[in-house]
Amino acid sequence: SVSEDLTHPVFSKLFVETEYLPESAALICGRRPRAPDEPRAWAVHVLSVDGRMQGPVEWETDRARFLGRGRGPEDPVALDGRPLSGTTGAVLDPIVSLRQRIRLAPGGFVRLSFSTGMVTTRESALAIAQKYHDPSAAARTFALAFTQTQGTLRHLGITSEEAQLFVNGESRGVKTK
């Protein structure tokens, strides 16, 4: 349960196993159930690259290796330029991090898209990873999300700037229809 996860976060993390899928540049994380009646949850994190890549995709699922000894999120060792470790499996404190070096010519264009989701089966996680590894699928999804957001804003009678005020918690002065 959520309350058990909050009470014992380290214990809860012991039930997460990570796996890298090279064919779709994705990490999937399966949370092993603690009880027979508990459903299994799967997270998927996938990278899509539209442009010229340089070298292989790198990944990290161990927070301690990502941060480094004595370092924190503001200055992780992962940003020092060294290759990521490629750790997977049952890690003590799981994260998902994908990295791809790119080559960008002067005036060139490269689009990197990261998609993250939660599903209830490994098969669904694999399907999402395969689908969103395709740059055109990621671009279509972002375009559809933008279109839906614009329709919602029109329906509410607010501008995108006013919507941003809501997101930032500054909604006192914004009135809708």
Annotate each predicted stretch with a short phrase.
Residues 28-30, 46, 98, 114, ...:
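Generic structural hydrophobic/aromatic packing signal, biased to beta-strands
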Residues 12, 98-100, 112:
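Hydrophobic residues positioned within well-ordered beta-strands of beta-sheet architectures
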Residues 54-94, 162-177:
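Edge strands and adjacent loops of beta-rich recognition modules
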Residues 94-96, 108:
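Residue-level preference for beta-strand/loop junctions
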Residues 86-89, 99-103:
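Beta-strand-rich interaction surfaces with strong enrichment in secreted/lumenal proteins
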